[in-house]
């Protein structure tokens, strides 16, 4: 590629009244008229070393708006292409008497672009079109020396080459800078950096989540909306917490049920059919009448005995048995005693036992113990402990 030729004066695009107008540089003559240069016209001689522009970035310079300097810097690869964290950065030129790059105001980038169309195939004899020269003025909103990391909120435009330009055609730095910015990801920092992972990652299922679902045989499209919104890991974490809360509530309910059951009142102890349950004992109230011996035999057949006042006094008082039913007391050679052989207390002796010495069986009348004839038929009560 031939080096671009520097025109005497190139037409500039018409700018609006609000946009700043670029000043004339030292290369332009006040009374010079625009003219077209031939294809192989020699470049004007400049004092000092020859100024060779970069092959891919063109020839241009940064100039502060409102600057009074008319001298353009000599382009060199050291400031035209400077890698910074995998991206191409341009180092601005500071004229004498101007502030440092850190305090620059908005600048203008003037670029001399020489476009030389590629001719037809070698076998074709058609002449190639003449090259055209364009002098472009591009306003830059911020100083190029301003580091990207110091202003993460600024949004950078994607560096895509325009048709007919030489951008990223021969410069590896420009190509790397274009590849490092992925518009699809919406992130202007390198894809592997933590800032991009935190800021550019969209909610939803990732590739790892899809792989896990496919391995488990679950279709990711049929999952609830909550999973697609917050992601599978966050959903599983919330599900685990819900299971923990449910387990705690279940344990509390189990403890409460056991405590209430243990503090319950009386336990239901079954008694034979026709028997009554009271105070941990079963009672049988007969509707027939028999002598004392027959009544005791009936109770013994049902693993019971005639009631003992020491154990059944409350029950007999509650039901007010006043028909003179038999009780488990009898007089023997050694005095009155219960059917289990325990002697009766003196205060429980029948009052009329001395008047009727032949009455040897005890009965209950009007709530008190009396001596009765053992052969007389009377109703009876059987008592036994629950099993």
Curated annotation (Swiss-Prot):
- State the UniProt keywords alphabetically: Disulfide bond, Lectin, Membrane, Phosphoprotein, Transmembrane, Transmembrane helix
Q: Tell where it localizes.
A: Membrane
Query: Which cysteine pairs are joined by S-S bonds?
Result: 299-382, 361-374
> Which SUPFAM superfamilies does UniProt cross-reference here?
C-type lectin-like (SSF56436)
> TM segments?
241-261
Sequence positions bearing Phosphoserine: 143
- Which segments carry the region annotation Disordered? 1-105, 155-174
Question: What molecular function does GO assign, one term?
Answer: carbohydrate binding
Instruction: List the coiled-coil residues.
Output: none
Q: Which residues form the C-type lectin domain?
A: 278-383
The cross-references to InterPro entries, in alphabetical order and at most eight, read: C-type_lectin-like, C-type_lectin-like/link_sf, CTDL_fold, KLRG2, NKR-like_CTLD
Q: Record's PANTHER family?
A: KILLER CELL LECTIN-LIKE RECEPTOR SUBFAMILY G MEMBER 2
Under what name is this protein listed? Killer cell lectin-like receptor subfamily G member 2
């Amino acid at each position: 590629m031939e080096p671009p030729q520097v025109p005497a004066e190139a037409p500039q695009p018409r700018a609006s009244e609000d946009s700043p107008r670029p000043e004339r540089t030292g290369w332009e003559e006040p009374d010079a008229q625009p003219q077209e240069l031939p294809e192989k016209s020699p470049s004007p001689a400049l004092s000092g070393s020859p100024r060779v522009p970069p092959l891919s970035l063109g020839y241009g310079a940064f100039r502060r708006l409102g600057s009074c300097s008319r001298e353009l810097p000599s382009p060199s690869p050291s400031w035209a292409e400077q890698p910074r964290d995998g991206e191409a950065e341009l180092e601005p030129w500071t004229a004498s008497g101007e502030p440092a790059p850190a305090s620059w105001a908005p600048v203008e980038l003037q670029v001399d672009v020489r476009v030389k169309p590629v001719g037809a195939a070698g076998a074709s004899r058609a002449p190639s079109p003449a090259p055209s020269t364009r002098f472009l003025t591009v306003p830059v909103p911020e100083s190029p020396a301003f580091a990207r990391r110091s202003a993460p909120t600024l949004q950078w435009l994607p560096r895509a080459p325009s048709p007919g330009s030489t951008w990223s055609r021969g410069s590896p730095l420009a190509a790397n800078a274009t590849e490092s910015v992925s518009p699809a990801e919406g992130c202007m920092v390198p894809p592997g950096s933590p800032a991009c992972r935190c800021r550019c990652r969209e909610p939803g299922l990732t590739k790892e989540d899809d792989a896990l679902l496919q391995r488990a045989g679950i279709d990711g499209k049929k999952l609830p909306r909550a999973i697609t919104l917050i992601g599978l890991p966050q959903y599983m974490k919330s599900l685990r917490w819900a299971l923990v809360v449910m387990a705690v509530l279940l344990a509390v309910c189990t403890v409460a049920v056991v405590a209430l059951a243990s503090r319950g009142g009386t336990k239901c102890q079954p008694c034979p059919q026709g028997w009554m349950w009271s105070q941990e004992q079963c009672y049988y109230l007969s509707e027939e009448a028999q002598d004392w011996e027959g009544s005791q035999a009936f109770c013994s057949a049902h693993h019971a005995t005639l009631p003992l006042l020491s154990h059944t006094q409350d029950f007999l008082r509650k039901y007010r048995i006043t028909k003179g039913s038999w009780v488990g007391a009898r007089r023997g050679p050694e005095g009155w005693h219960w059917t289990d052989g325990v002697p009766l207390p003196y205060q429980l002796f029948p009052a009329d036992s001395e008047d009727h010495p032949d009455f040897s069986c005890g009965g209950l009348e009007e709530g008190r113990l009396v001596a009765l004839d053992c052969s007389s038929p009377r109703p009876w009560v059987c008592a036994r402990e629950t099993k």
